[in-house]
């Protein structure tokens, strides 16, 4: 298994000029700490959205769409047919649509995401791997020992290269709750962090933000919530691989929180491991009002102890596509933008949940509640993308 991955890496290292991402805090003096920067090959670092076609206030942001299921394969899915290769190709076919609307980054998970099988007629399984075939899901790029599955990584590399061609960025999630239990113990989780990061280095994937875990603080990770407790260690482990391997680049590393404010706390707490070792703050805003999100991003932006840019890289309002929800969705984008952060929309009904099909937006952004649901879902996605485009482009 390791041999196959290594051969894949040798074939591409040094091929072409890769787009590279960093935060201003990583680059140091003379750069804006809360901004994202890109460069082509050995060219100069420039803030994102720099150029005559962009609005000045867009510079340094990283607008995002969550495409968590882009490389997924549920190995226990027998109830319906699914081709993981064609699934990835559908995502690639949608990238130009995303880019022309100002999207620079997509979030993709090496352990999938909530497929909401329970909403279907034929698949009656839930997320936990530990439930076994017929009851749980097996969605993981990792083997139990922390090594990588070649087919998963081939799809991931293909997608990373297609993003690179377009000057776009891969937000790569390593671990997802309920699938971390694929890994047999905490040592295997450490090993998976190392192997995934080494894979990025070996394949010269410079257009990537590493997200160690999705909602690390949600309470659903296994082994005594190891990933949550060891977040600082895991971030340092990933960052250390670039030094250990003598890499010519270093990727931004963090993990996303669920955005909750616990009882008795006035502001959202950023874990010590992320505050002390992370390069940016990733958080989620699902189901929260625009004004709550505005307040939280503003608080984070104003806290000098918080590292790098602030990105809400997963956000949706109620998982419906009505006009009422659209108003709140666009209001969330506005609130985060006006507070200085970057925003990432989660197209929950369009393609996070099974059967992962509507990766492309509709041709019209006119949303009417009386529309057939599939048509309304696509129009809703188009309306969100058009709203983002108006913020990015002059």
For the regions a protein language model found, what residue spans apply to each?
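Sequence-pattern detector for short linear motifs
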Residues: 7, 69, 130, 158, ...
């Amino acid at each position: 298994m390791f041999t196959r991955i290594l051969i894949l890496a040798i074939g591409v290292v040094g091929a072409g000029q890769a787009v590279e991402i960093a935060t201003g805090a990583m680059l140091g003096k003379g750069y804006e700490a809360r901004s994202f920067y890109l460069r082509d090959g050995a060219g100069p670092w420039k803030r994102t959205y720099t150029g005559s076609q962009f609005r000045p206030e867009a510079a340094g942001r990283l607008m995002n769409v969550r495409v968590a299921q882009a490389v997924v394969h549920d190995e226990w899915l027998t109830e319906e047919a699914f081709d993981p290769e064609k699934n990835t190709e559908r995502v690639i076919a949608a990238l130009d649509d995303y880019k022309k609307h100002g999207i620079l980054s997509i979030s993709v998970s090496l352990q999938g995401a909530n497929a909401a099988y329970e909403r279907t007629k034929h698949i009656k399984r839930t997320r936990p791997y530990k439930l076994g075939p017929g009851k749980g899901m097996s969605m993981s790029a990792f083997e139990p020992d922390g090594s990588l599955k070649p087919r998963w990584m081939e799809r991931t590399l293909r997608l990373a290269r297609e993003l690179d061609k377009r000057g776009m960025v891969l937000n790569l999630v390593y671990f997802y709750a309920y699938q971390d239990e694929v890994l047999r113990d905490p040592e295997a989780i450490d090993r998976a962090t190392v192997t995934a990061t080494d894979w990025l280095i070996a394949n010269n994937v410079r257009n990537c933000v590493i997200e160690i875990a999705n909602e690390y603080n949600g309470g659903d990770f296994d082994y005594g919530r190891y990933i949550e407790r060891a977040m600082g260690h895991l971030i340092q482990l990933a960052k250390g691989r670039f030094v250990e391997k003598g890499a010519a680049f270093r990727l931004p590393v963090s993990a996303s929180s669920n955005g909750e404010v616990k009882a008795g706390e006035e502001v959202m707490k950023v874990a010590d491991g992320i505050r002390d070792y992370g390069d940016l703050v990733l958080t989620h805003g699902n189901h929260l009002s625009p004004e709550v999100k505005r307040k939280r991003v503003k608080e984070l932006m104003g806290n000098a102890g918080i590292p790098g840019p602030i990105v809400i890289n997963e956000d949706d309002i109620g998982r419906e596509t009505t006009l009422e929800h659209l108003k709140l969705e666009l209001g969330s984008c506005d609130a985060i933008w006006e507070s200085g952060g970057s925003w990432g929309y989660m197209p929950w009904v369009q393609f996070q949940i099974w059967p992962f099909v509507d990766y492309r937006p509709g041709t019209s952004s006119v949303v009417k509640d009386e529309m057939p649901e599939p048509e309304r879902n696509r129009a809703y996605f188009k309306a969100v993308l058009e709203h983002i485009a108006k913020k990015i482009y002059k």
